[in-house]
């Protein structure tokens, strides 16, 4: 009887997991279609090659990033982690005069060299290399992995912050985003996009971001967008429509 019950429970678990996977895969395909149809509207966009998914952001992430760039037109963007999203933001910096500054934080000299061999960044894009400290496992609020020694002026006047680095931590993942939130004022115009928000570490980070915003009496909107991976947007009251894309 116990073996039969165990097999029944395992079958039920497999069915739920399989169904969830299929639902996420279907949602991912829809996001791919939505992004493709909304993005390929000019020659430079049609010529931009992006590898979406796996270590890079998913289709929902790229659609949300594209919409924020189009709708908000940020003059300054700070990006945590060098990758496919850097191509998209830098291409906007090359082709749109409203994007004046794009700062990318990255820790790996090898990856920076490999990326720059394959892609020419805009003159308005700048990579700043910062070492990492902390750890990804058995960590907490004080010792999760993050970039070291980020100057406070990096965050000043940034309207958009994209968080897709460094590597995720089990707890309080990608905590450098707190430094950006702490320097905001109640009337600051801002958008923060956090990738991989389906993971526990990123969920803990989002909880702390909410706590910080509330403590600073900052009104904000928040929305998670799904697919094979999830990303979450947190924005000031100036951009309420970003929570219903």
Task: Give residue spans per PLM region.
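Glycine-rich phosphate-binding "P-loop"
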Residues: 37-57, 74, 165-170
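SAM cofactor-binding core of SAM-dependent methyltransferases
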Residues: 56-133
């Amino acid at each position: 009887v116990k073996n039969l019950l165990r097999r029944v429970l395992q079958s039920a678990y497999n069915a739920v997991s399989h169904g969830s996977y299929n639902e996420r895969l279907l949602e991912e395909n829809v996001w791919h279609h939505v992004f493709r149809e909304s993005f390929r509207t000019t020659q430079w966009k049609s010529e931009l090659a992006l590898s979406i998914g796996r270590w890079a952001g998913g289709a929902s992430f790229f659609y949300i990033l594209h919409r924020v760039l189009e709708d908000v037109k940020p003059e300054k963007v700070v990006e945590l982690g060098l990758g496919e999203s850097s191509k998209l933001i830098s291409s906007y910096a090359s082709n749109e005069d409203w994007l004046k500054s794009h700062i990318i934080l990255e820790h790996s000299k090898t990856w920076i060299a490999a990326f720059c061999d394959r892609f020419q960044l805009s003159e308005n894009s700048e990579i700043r290399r910062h070492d990492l400290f902390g750890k990804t496992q058995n960590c907490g609020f004080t010792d999760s992995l993050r970039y070291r020694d980020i100057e406070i002026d990096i965050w000043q006047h940034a309207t958009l912050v994209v968080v897709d680095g460094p590597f995720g931590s089990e707890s309080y993942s990608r905590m450098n985003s707190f430094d950006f939130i702490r320097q905001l004022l109640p009337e600051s115009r801002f958008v923060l996009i956090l990738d991989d928000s389906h993971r526990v570490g990123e969920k803990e980070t989002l909880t702390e971001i909410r706590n910080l915003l509330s403590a600073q009496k900052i009104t904000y909107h928040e929305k998670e967008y799904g697919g094979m991976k999830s990303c979450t947007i947190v924005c000031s009251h100036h951009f309420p429509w970003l929570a219903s894309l």
